[in-house]
């Protein structure tokens, strides 16, 4: 699934040649062609450090470490984004399923999917995000 067929225009317009130079092949395939990294292989699956997870394409802050939880699914999971403005959601009919795709609302990079099986005492949502779509910026707990 390529985002080229999507009608939505995002504020950050990325140059494909520049992205191919700057991103790893996995980062490029995940963010630009909605690929999925293999479960339990991502850099941030088990990260517990305090900080902010940002879009690997445009550096938009997306998730705080305080919203991260261990879901056991094999990908970093969060019960909410940093705020309601940073995420774009789109129905995804690929692979014979109906899911909700999660994209960066600034550049349109594919991040992962959101499911309704997250912590019930929080939002009930599980944002299942590819590590390859993220960069982590460590921050002290008290910031």
UniProtKB/Swiss-Prot annotation:
Residues 16-139 form the MsrB domain. One of its GO terms (molecular function) is zinc ion binding. PROSITE patterns: MSRB. Keywords: Metal-binding, Oxidoreductase, Zinc. Its EC number is 1.8.4.12. GO terms for biological process: protein repair; response to oxidative stress. It comes from the Bacteria. Its cofactor is Zn(2+). One of its GO terms (cellular component) is cytoplasm. Zn(2+) binds at residues 55, 58, 104, 107. It catalyses: L-methionyl-[protein] + [thioredoxin]-disulfide + H2O = L-methionyl-(R)-S-oxide-[protein] + [thioredoxin]-dithiol. The active site is at 128 (nucleophile). Pfam families: SelR. Binds 1 zinc ion per subunit. The zinc ion is important for the structural integrity of the protein. Gene3D superfamilies: Peptide methionine sulfoxide reductase. Belongs to the MsrB Met sulfoxide reductase family. PANTHER family: METHIONINE SULFOXIDE REDUCTASE, METHIONINE-R-SULFOXIDE REDUCTASE B1. HAMAP family: MsrB (MF_01400). NCBIfam families: peptide-methionine (R)-S-oxide reductase MsrB. This is Peptide methionine sulfoxide reductase MsrB.
